[in-house]
């Protein structure tokens, strides 16, 4: 039986060992190297495939992150502190005004500071129906303010207006004044953080935006400047002129309404934008020339009525700035503001 089976078995032919000579050494070397390539190339292929897979995973992850971020910011309108930090890094728009992007970070900064003040300082409960209406109102006002800042940035380029670091520091110095003197920068930063949740960088940015809008408003309003020049001429011609009568006369038949205010006795350090400080420089009955207060809302003329060591009594007239608000209203009415989020009107609820 074994003999029969052996007939059908294929015997493996044993290759006789070949001798390595000087003539065959190159052939043997190539045969050995070829045998090693099967171990080398699979590793190279695996590395190449690993790189491709890593790129694909990274792209997919990036798309997912961007999609989730877009969904959180626009459809959901996530207003968390985390999303604010994201928008500070990524300059995403929340709207456009006359082609100028309105940054989402500016909108959130204004919104979050107001919410922070209500919750931490006013101890307001924003989860009630009234609180929810307050939230919607704050969203509307924050959007309006952010749009106005963005429009001011657009006009600043055309008017060649800018804010320097010295302007910002001067504003800081004015805002740090108190009845007991100037508070420190650290104290001011602590107050801003406690009241509004602003870091020092946030406060710097807010101040820069405010000053730029003021400068644009002054540069744009030629009518207010002309009115101010006319009042200056009248005061020079009649130093004892009655400011109340002057304001009434100039307002009659004019598109600009000159405001008149009497202060009564107030501290010389009264936080009124610098009006009391300006009045303290005058002699009794003297009227100042035009000056721009820290509020940045017009040209002021102040007259000192009386004073003592710590207080002043004064009256003043104000030439308001209207051109910027008029220009912004025109842009809005012409449909040149596009908002990328929907904010319900709280007045309709």
What does each model-identified segment do?
Residues 1-133, 274, 278-284, 294, ...:
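Short, low-structural-confidence N-terminal segments
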Residues 112, 116-119, 143-164, 168, ...:
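Sec-exported extracytoplasmic/periplasmic mature domains
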């Amino acid at each position: 039986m074994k003999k029969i089976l052996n007939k059908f078995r294929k015997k493996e032919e044993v290759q006789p060992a070949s001798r390595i000579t000087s003539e065959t050494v190159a052939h043997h070397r190539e045969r050995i190297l070829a045998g090693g390539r099967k171990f080398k190339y699979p590793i190279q292929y695996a590395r190449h495939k690993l790189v491709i897979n890593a790129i694909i995973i990274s792209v997919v992850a990036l798309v997912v992150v961007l999609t989730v971020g877009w969904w959180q910011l626009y459809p959901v309108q996530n207003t968390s502190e985390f999303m604010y930090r994201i928008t500070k890094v990524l300059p995403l728009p929340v709207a456009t005004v006359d082609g100028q992007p309105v940054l989402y970070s500016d909108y959130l900064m204004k919104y979050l500071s107001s919410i922070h003040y209500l919750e931490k300082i006013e101890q307001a409960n924003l989860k009630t129906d009234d609180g929810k209406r307050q939230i919607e109102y704050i969203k509307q006002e924050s959007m309006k303010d952010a749009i106005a800042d963005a429009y001011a940035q657009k006009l600043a380029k055309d008017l060649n207006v800018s804010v320097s670091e010295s302007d910002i520091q001067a504003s800081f110095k004015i805002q740090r004044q108190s009845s007991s003197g100037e508070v420190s920068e650290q104290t001011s930063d602590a107050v801003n953080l406690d009241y509004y949740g602003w870091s020092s960088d946030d406060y710097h940015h807010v101040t820069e935006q405010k000053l730029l809008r003021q400068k644009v408003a002054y540069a744009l309003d030629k009518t207010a400047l002309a009115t101010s020049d006319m009042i200056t001429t009248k005061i020079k011609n009649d130093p004892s002129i009655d400011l109340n009568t002057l304001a009434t006369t100039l307002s009659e038949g004019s598109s600009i309404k000159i405001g008149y205010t009497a202060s009564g006795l107030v501290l010389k350090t009264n936080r009124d934008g610098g009006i009391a400080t300006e009045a303290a420089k005058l002699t009794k009955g003297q009227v100042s020339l035009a000056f721009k207060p820290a509020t940045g809302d017009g040209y002021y003329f102040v007259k000192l009525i009386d004073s003592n060591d710590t207080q002043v009594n004064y009256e003043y007239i104000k030439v308001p700035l209207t051109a910027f608000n008029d220009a912004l209203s025109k842009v809005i009415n012409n449909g040149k503001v596009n908002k990328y989020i929907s904010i319900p009107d709280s007045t309709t609820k």
